[in-house]
Design a protein with these regions (language model features):
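Classical Sec-dependent N-terminal signal peptides that target proteins to the secretory pathway
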Residues: 1-24
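Low-complexity intrinsically disordered segments
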Residues: 3, 58, 154-156
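Composition-driven detection of intrinsically disordered, low-complexity segments
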Residues: 14, 86, 158-161
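Short loop/turn hinge sites at secondary-structure boundaries
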Residues: 23, 71-72, 149-150
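N-terminal segment of the mature folded domain
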Residues: 26-118, 122-124
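Ligand-binding clefts/hinges and TM-proximal coupling segments of bilobed small-molecule sensing domains
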Residues: 116-161
């Protein structure tokens, strides 16, 4: 093998390694409703980071009338059932009901974006399925413990309140 081929293989290997590393560090974007409080979203975010070693970003949007381009910027949705019902059916994949708010009895549902709807494939589907499994397993228990321990809320910038 000559020097050019060796250099080319090293360069391609480096690009692939960096691409995999950067791809793994991408945070999941989850659209949420303003009714979910920032302290509860912090609880979800910190638990997700601890369990999955990956970041999650919660994005609050004002309008439910979102274009396909805007919807495809999200990896998943955590919304009240009523708002989830207004979303295009083709955009959602595996809608799951997770928990109910104590105050106004709002039922919250979680759904992944359908990767075929957004023309995303490959490893993206596997990553989304990991996100879904975590939410289905952990979010209901975190919501319940958050309700029970509401006087002991944690915020990233505060110490526990009593």
């Amino acid at each position: 093998m000559n020097i050019f081929q060796t250099s080319l293989k090293c360069c391609v290997g480096l690009v692939l390694s960096v691409g995999v590393l950067l791809g793994d560090s991408k945070a999941f974007k989850v659209r949420v409703d303003k009714s979910l409080t920032p302290p509860f979203l912090n609880v979800l975010s910190l638990a997700f980071k601890q369990d999955m070693k990956k970041e999650i970003v919660f994005v609050i949007t004002k309008s439910n009338k979102l274009s396909k381009k805007v919807l495809c910027d999200f990896d998943a949705f955590l919304l009240p059932e009523a708002l989830m019902g207004d979303m295009p059916e083709k955009a959602l994949f595996h809608k799951e009901f997770l928990f109910q708010s104590k105050e106004n009895k709002t039922l919250y549902a979680f759904s992944l974006i359908d990767s075929q709807y957004c023309s995303k494939g490959g490893n993206y589907r596997n990553e989304l399925e990991k996100l879904e499994r975590w939410f289905v397993q952990k979010a209901p228990e975190l919501a319940e413990s958050y309700r029970v321990n509401y006087k002991n809320q944690y915020n990233k910038t505060q110490t526990p309140q009593k």
